Amino acid sequence: MLHLGTLVAVFVVLWKDIWALLRRPFQRLTALLIAATVPTVIIALAFKDLIEEAFHSGSTLGWEFLATAVVLVGAEKLAARAAAARRTELDMTFPDALIVGTLQGVAIMPAVSRSGLTIAGSLARNLDRSFAARFSFLLSIPAILGAVVFQAKDLAEGAAAGGGFTLPILVGTLTAMAVGVFAVKFTMRIIREGSMMGFAAYVGVLGVLVLLDQHLFRFFF
């Protein structure tokens, strides 16, 4: 149910873009979003067992945080080199979409930032920063819907065992929606006006701390 709260948050922030897609569904942006979704679905289905094991064990969390940091730094470096020749939405190609969608598939792993990797992919392809953020969050819609469908059976079984959808679930969903609205707006502003270097440093330090705890201190892992 938390996924639904996040989905509503995306709709709240990007309602103009979503309405434009609904009014004119057979436009190029729709085709790009579909193309980007294909590799995500393929990766999710092909590595389903591996992904579930990663979620349950948590053994790869530290490396995933570090990998996210490296990708973000690399994307910002590439984007800075080509800042004078930024490509717009009209310039995005289907290979661009496939690359971004593949990164979204990789980001199914628990400690990999979906928005971070997809935005980084767009920046690495020299796409406009504002469009990179918009495309990333629009692309999250089919991904979130897929996750909801994928977990529908577990949700139904949990609801039946617990006597229905309880107050904590409702509160969690509403909280996810409120936090999601703030997170989407904040991320889009950072991407448009700033840099992902701060977030890269954060996840990099977090990755080091997690690895130290997993292999030395064992306070949490």
Task: Indicate where each model-derived feature is located.
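Multi-pass membrane proteins that catalyze or facilitate reactions on polyprenyl-/lipid-phosphate substrates
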Residues: M1-F221
